[in-house]
C-alpha cells in the first residue's frame, strides 16, 4: 500500500497565523512536525526528501509560509468540503471566525493522517505530559467504528476547542462531562454512510457515558454515534495504468492526468498548460518577475523556495546521496533515484506516436517536439528556431564565441560541457564501449550506437529534397545546408562562413597556428587529424592512395558535399 507522504500531514502557517500562536503552541508544533518527518524516514528511508519546513525548523528559523492567492478554480477539494460548514453547536456564543478557531481546524485537518498510526498516537500521549492540554490542537478525536465509510462519503472531523474560547453550554446530545475536562469539542457530521456502535462504559459513579478507546472523549448520551472509522482507512482507488493506490477518487483523477497528458490549466499570458492548478500558480510567478527568496550567501534571488534550496547546495557542496553502483554522489535523493535508472535501464516514459521509451520524462517531452515540429525558442540574432532552450543557449555561443568549459589537462576551452567530457577521453584514452562485430572501442555509448548503424546499414534519416538517406540526424542537418546554402558559422578574423562548426574550427587554426595533432615518431605536428593519418603512412611504409588523373588539370577542386578544397591533384 502506498505510504503517506509528508505533504499529506504537513501544516503550513502564514506569517499572520504564526503570530497568533503562543510560544508553547509553537514549540508543540515544531515537535510534532519533526516527529512526523522522523517517522516517515524510519519507514521509507531514502525515498523521503527532507522538506523545506524541516530545514527551517532545524536551523531555528520560523516556518511560516508566504500567502498565495488562488483563483476560484484552483481551490483544493478539501477546502470546498469545509466551506459553508454547519456546526452542531450554533447556540454557542464563542467566535466562529476567531483566529484560534481557524488555526485549530486547519491543524486538525492536516494532522488527520498523522494521528492514525499507533506509533504516532503513543508519541501524542508523551506530548500530553510535556505540553498538557495544548496537544489537543494537533490531534483529532478518533472513535471506534465497526464499519469503514466509503471514500465518496463526505464527513467532517472532530474539532477540539481549547480553553481560550469563551465557555458556553452545548446543546444535546453533545454535552461533555465537565469533571477534569476543560476542553469542549463538537462532532461535525454530514452524509455519513452507516451508523457505528461506540463502546459504553460506566464512569463518574455509575453514569453511562460514551467513551472512545482511542481519544478518551466522553459523551453523556447512550446513543450510537455516526462517525467514520479513521484508524483503518484504506486506499481503495487504484490506477489501472501503474497500480498506484489512493484514498480519494479526486486524487486518482488528478494522478490519471500523468498518463493521459491532460493539462486543463492554461496560462493566459503565454498559453502554456499544466495538469495541476498548483503548477499554474507556481508558473505565474515567472511572469510577475517576483523573486522573494534570496540566498544569504551570494544574494541571488529565486521565485520559488525549492529553487533556493537547490541553489544553496552549490555553496555547501554537500552530496549525501551516493550511488552504490558507481559511487557517484548527489545533493538530492530525487537526483539519485533518477540516476539509478541509468543502471537499471528502466524506461518509464514511452512515446505514444512511435513507441520509443525514455528514462527521463524531460527526454520524452523533448522527443515529442520532433513529431509536432514545435520550435518555440528563436535566436534573435539569426532567427533560427529550436525545440529546446538548451539548444538555443548552445547555438547563441556561435554568435558570442563564448567558451566557458576548460580542460584542466591542455587548457582547451569548449562551448558546452558535453564537448568537454568528450574531449577529456582523449587524455585518458579510456574506451570502455566495444563493438561486438568488429571489436572497435569507443569512449562513449552514444558513439558505439552510432557506429553500429554502419554494420546494419540503417539510415533512418532521409532528405526530403533529394531523397538521400543518412545514419545520423546530424548528418542529415549538415547535408540539408547544401540545398539551402546556409552557412551559420562565421570566422571572426576574416569573415569567412561555413556550414559546419567543425570546418570553422579547422579554419581558425590557420589564424592561430594551432597544430594539435603530433606524430609520435618524428614529432611533426599538423592542424588536421587526417593530415596526421596520411603522414603516419610514411613511417609505416604504406603508399598513399593514388587518384586517377583527369584530362584537364584544375587549380582548385571543390567537393560540393564537404566544402574541402584541394590545390593540386595527386598522381
From Swiss-Prot:
An annotated Gene Ontology molecular function: RNA polymerase II cis-regulatory region sequence-specific DNA binding
InterPro entries: C2H2-ZF_domain-containing, KRAB, KRAB_dom_sf, Znf_C2H2_sf, Znf_C2H2_type
Gene3D superfamilies tied to this protein: 6.10.140.140, Classic Zinc Finger
One Gene Ontology biological process: regulation of transcription by RNA polymerase II
Zinc finger map (C2H2-type): 237-259, 265-287, 293-315, 321-343, 349-371, 377-399, 405-427, 433-455, 461-483, 489-511, 517-539
DNA-binding among keywords: yes
SMART domains the record matches: KRAB (SM00349), ZnF_BED (SM00614), ZnF_C2H2 (SM00355)
Cross-link (Glycyl lysine isopeptide (Lys-Gly) (interchain with G-Cter in SUMO2)): 109, 126
Domain KRAB intervals: 4-76
Function: May be involved in transcriptional regulation.
The name this protein goes by in its record: Zinc finger protein 181
Organism per entry: Homo sapiens (Human)
